Amino acid sequence: MCVDVPCENCIVRNDGLRLKCSECAEGSSKLFPRQNRQHSSAISHISNSSPPTRKRSIDGGYTSGTDSANTSEIVIKKRLTFSKKSHSTSEIETWNAHLQVDYHLETVTPSCSTVYQKITSETLIEIMQKLSQIEFMQKYILIDCRYDYEYNGGHIKGAQSLFNPETAADFFFNKDGSKKINRIPIFYCEYSQKRGPTMANNLREVDRKLNSNIYPRCDYEEIYLLEGGYKNFYAFTRGLEKEQRVQLCEPDNYVIMFDDRYKAELRKHQFHKKNVSKPMKKWSSTTSVISILTTSGTRISTLRQTCDPIHEHDAH
């Protein structure tokens, strides 16, 4: 056995490195026991140690065992995300896209509609007296939704008659769908409970259809409804001087819808017959389809008519 000098069993390479035989290697371990124990201990640690654990992550990859806390947090977040219904970007944008209207007139609160706001007779009279007739007509358009005999019997001065919902599209829009009237509409009927709100809703439905590509924007965004209708307006003017009344009502008179003198006229209006032929009932919202056909054939559109809640006895 040899330690420093190679024996006959050892192999010496050309570069001078000696490869010890088994006897020389055993003798070397006896001479340097501590060094060999450290070496063997290191080898034992390496051979016995297991590779780092890897866990399957929720998104298909792997994470090391040292990141178990972070992995748990990620898994929880992922599960919460997956538990919620996914929605497209267009749906989210549509939900957030509400029409914002800056109503410059004093309105009645709380609001009862997303289409229009109500104003009182006092507010309307104040505007009519503050502005000249030309100034008022340049900014506003009064729409009387009562039947022609009611309108002719007495209406708000400067108001235009429009009682047929099927003509709303042609009244407010040109044949090419562009805006026809550059004024703010104010609707009313006898009580402003049925015909006035219906006409305002029809205007918004047609507006939405023609401007669907720029939703939620509309051509007629600011819309008003006269609270209490012509009945309340006429009653309010009774407290004014005669000179003031004639500037507000034209003629200074009031004809109710069920006036016995106009029974034959009332029967001519198919719109009213369709609504009073069936028992009236309360509802929060209803939809009926009205087809608007123009004789020129340039526009054929279908709108959904949405009515406000009404009373069982009301057909106005």
Swiss-Prot record:
Uppermost EC category: hydrolase
Biased segments, Low complexity type: 39-50
EC number: 3.1.3.48
UniProt KW Ligase keyword: no
Pfam name, any one: Rhodanese
Domain Rhodanese: from-to ranges: 136-242
Catalytic activity from the UniProt record: O-phospho-L-tyrosyl-[protein] + H2O = L-tyrosyl-[protein] + phosphate
InterPro entries documented for this protein: MPI_Phosphatase, Rhodanese-like_dom, Rhodanese-like_dom_sf
GO biological process: cell division; G2/M transition of mitotic cell cycle; mitotic cell cycle; positive regulation of G2/M transition of mitotic cell cycle; positive regulation of G2/MI transition of meiotic cell cycle
Any one GO MF annotation of this record: protein tyrosine phosphatase activity
Gene Ontology CC annotations of this record: cytoplasm; nucleus
Region Disordered: start-end pairs: 35-65
Keyword annotations: Cell cycle, Cell division, Hydrolase, Mitosis, Protein phosphatase
Record-stated family: Belongs to the MPI phosphatase family.
PANTHER family per the UniProt record, alphabetical: M-PHASE INDUCER PHOSPHATASE, M-PHASE INDUCER PHOSPHATASE DUAL SPECIFICITY PHOSPHATASE CDC25
Protein name: M-phase inducer phosphatase cdc-25.3
Gene that encodes the chain: cdc-25.3
